[in-house]
């Protein structure tokens, strides 16, 4: 094999029954505000939408972020619970 060639590694297939990962506070914010940003800026690219959402998130005060952080905490607890149940089910 030539020194510039890379070995192909096969990725482990994801189990469709595995619990979905928890969302971060930013992701809850982005999901809630994505359509608003698109409506305010028609015709912008997907990347630009993300950039504007990031700027809006950074501009929020810590108090404004609290509802999103609470949602993220709740979702994290859900994920941990589902992950434990999934691990218990698949260990047997």
From Swiss-Prot:
* Entry-linked Pfam families: HMG_box
Q: Does the keyword DNA-binding apply?
A: yes
For the region Disordered, give the residue spans. 1-21, 63-92
Q: Where in the cell is it found?
A: Nucleus; Chromosome
Q: Which GO terms describe its cellular component?
A: chromosome; nucleus
> What family does this chain come from, according to its entry?
Belongs to the NHP6 family.
The protein depicted here goes by the name Non-histone chromosomal protein 6
Q: Which organism is it from?
A: Debaryomyces hansenii (strain ATCC 36239 / CBS 767 / BCRC 21394 / JCM 1990 / NBRC 0083 / IGC 2968) (Yeast)
